[in-house]
Amino acid sequence: MILVTGTLPLQPSQKDAALDAVREVQRHTRSEPGNHAYEFALDIDDDHRLRIHEEWASDEALNEHMASAHFAAFLERIGDKLAGAPEVVRWDGATSRPLFE
């Protein structure tokens, strides 16, 4: 399992346009083979910061996503809407289980 987490700082004046770009990339990505989760959420303490959570079955699935036309289009659309550099981290993990059983 590959996890991707991070944040995207948004320019306040570009927040709505950024959210439109996110909705579009989510629509395509959630149906990709090997994608288990593709979520963005506004930070509870800063509503101009998006939190990223992705889950992928394999390196291959993540690499195919990153090479896709819709992800390239997202990068193009989101770039000028950011207030700073994105902070995105990839995590490699083998197992998961419910925290509260």
PLM segments and residue spans:
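Short secondary-structure boundary/capping segments
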Residues: L42, G79-D80
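Outer-membrane beta-barrel domain signature
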Residues: F71-R77
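Intrinsically disordered, low-complexity N-terminal regions enriched in serine/proline/glycine
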Residues: A37-E39, A73
